Amino acid sequence: LAGDDKQQQSSQNRTHGKTSLSGKKTMFHKAITRLLAPLLLLAFVGGCSQPATPDVSFTTLDGQTSRLSALRGKVVLVNFWATTCTTCVAEMPKLVDTHNKFAAQGFETLAIAMSYDPPDYVRNYARNNALPFKVAVDASGEAAKGFDDVRLTPTTFLIDERGQVVQKFLGEPDFDKLHARIAQLLAEPA
């Protein structure tokens, strides 16, 4: 009964334009929460750095072994693909166009074939399609593991000049948006 009396009095106070002390505290806390929540979110998001690119080693079809860190200072598109992947094969001419459009501006493309793709198939595909960029076979699967354990193809990563992953694409990217993003990254001071 005592609880009912307090509730009834609180209700009467509100109906007569009065607010109890506990009601004022609640309103104050809500107002502060509404003000601080967006600021805390901005601080958190602003403080988050982009994921660093794994410094994977790769061997290109021409036998050159290199590390991804050797491409630092360039905007890089790393594409994990397979010759048996129809989406990969369908997007390859667009990757070629993208590479050709931006290569003279410090842009690099690296196509890494998955470990299950026979090297001879990859070599034949690259030769028959005159791929103008570096092509590697991830025979050990270590490169795919280094990039968040890539299992689906195509999976593509856009990396800025500082070596940070700025975008990840599962499936074929929207190439108009990709081109705009590459142009933006190339225009940024290093």
Segments predicted by a language model, with ranges:
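N-terminal "domain-start" segment that seeds a small globular fold
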Residues: 46-69
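Short, charge-rich patches within N-terminal targeting peptides
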Residues: 4-12
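Bacterial N-terminal signal peptides
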Residues: 36-46
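Structural microenvironment flanking redox-active thiols in thiol-disulfide oxidoreductases
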Residues: 89-129, 139-145
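Bacterial N-terminal signal peptides that target proteins for export
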Residues: 25-37
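Thiol/disulfide oxidoreductase modules built on the thioredoxin-like
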Residues: 127-132, 139-183
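Short active-site neighborhood of thiol/selenol oxidoreductases, capturing the structured segment around
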Residues: 68-86
